[in-house]
Each structure stands twice: as C-alpha cells, then as structure tokens.
Amino acid sequence: MATPNPNKQPVELNRASLFIGLLLVLVLALLFSSYFFN
C-alpha cells in the first residue's frame, strides 16, 4: 500500500479493516475466555 489508488473507495477500505478488526477481537476474546474458564 505504497501508492493509494484513487479508484478505490475509502469507505470500502474502512469497512474491510473494521471487519478484520472485529474478527481479531472475537478470536482474542475466545482465547482469553478459554484461558479464564479452564
């Protein structure tokens, strides 16, 4: 991602990054809950 493409909409990029962030948070929450409840 060195040169930003003017054809790409920033809204879609923000949605993709937000979706990936939510997935990471869910995985981390599952790992922490498994640690705490064992």
Curated annotation (Swiss-Prot):
Stored Pfam families: PsbL (PF02419)
Entry membrane topology: Single-pass membrane protein
Membrane-spanning parts: 17-37
InterPro entries registered for this protein in UniProt: PSII_PsbL (IPR003372), PSII_PsbL_sf (IPR037266)
GO CC annotations, alphabetized: photosystem II reaction center; plasma membrane-derived thylakoid membrane
Record keyword Acetylation present: no
Localisation: Cellular thylakoid membrane
Keywords linked to the UniProt accession: Membrane, Photosynthesis, Photosystem II, Reaction center, Thylakoid, Transmembrane, Transmembrane helix
Record's keyword annotation contains Membrane: yes
Main subcellular localisation: membrane
Family: Belongs to the PsbL family.
NCBIfam families: PRK00753.1
Purpose: One of the components of the core complex of photosystem II (PSII). PSII is a light-driven water:plastoquinone oxidoreductase that uses light energy to abstract electrons from H(2)O, generating O(2) and a proton gradient subsequently used for ATP formation. It consists of a core antenna complex that captures photons, and an electron transfer chain that converts photonic excitation into a charge separation. This subunit is found at the monomer-monomer interface and is required for correct PSII assembly and/or dimerization.
Protein name as annotated: Photosystem II reaction center protein L
Organism: Acaryochloris marina (strain MBIC 11017)
